[in-house]
Amino acid sequence: MTGAGVADLNDKTVLVTGAAGAIGKAVVAAVRKAGGKAIASDLKGRPGIDVALDVTSEADWQRAVAAIDRLDGLVNAAGIAAVANIEKTDFATWRRVLSINLDGTFLGCKYAFALLRKQGGAIVNLSSVLGLVGGPNLAAYTASKGGVSLLTKSVALYGARFKPPVRCNAVCPAFVEGPMVDEIASGTKDPGTVKNKLALDVPLGRLGAPEEVAALCAYLLSDASAFITGADVPIDGGLTAR
């Protein structure tokens, strides 16, 4: 067993988007701890980045993939949230959230696939429990993550045709400690109370940790999960068990 749990990623190369964010950064660390090579990508100028990549840019994806000789895994971790119900969500915000969360995931799957199918591989898309059950005050975010989950299933079914296959799964966290939760809370009158309420709503009584999500991603990238594809995997402290 490695430091990343049951994951063994020796000799595997994994591209991680959103690598400057809390979850993306933790995924990069988990891949490296499990023996793999992580290529950290995010917007130009972000810290700890190997490759500058705007996930909404088709040209950026083409350029990034062209520079990689071998790819065994992809983690689409880039994402943003916008706190607003359907009446308060303006169209520009809607387009921006879907562009990063859903279009970015689509482009990643599309352009990385040719490299992955050469020897088989795994894609992990960051969805959310709010893509499974919805949320009244995150209209654009829930729509984007619901799209990510169904895109994942389509890619998984296509990837299963290849021998060896290209697996594709979605990780669905509840609220996780980090800038995104801080941003959601900051849009309210009492951020501290809101964060505490988010934690109390979880049966296990706390928010998730980026490292916990990253460990699950590492497992889904590894050969230990070879019979798992097309799945929405909640990591939510029991939130969706209700």
Can you name each region flagged by the protein language model?
Residues 2-5, 133, 218, 229-242:
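Short C-terminal tail/terminal secondary-structure segment
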Residues 128:
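Residue(s) in the substrate-gating loop at a strand-loop-helix junction
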Residues 170, 192-224, 228, 237:
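C-terminal helical subdomain
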Residues 85-86, 93-98, 194, 198:
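Substrate-binding pocket helix/loop in short-chain dehydrogenase/reductase
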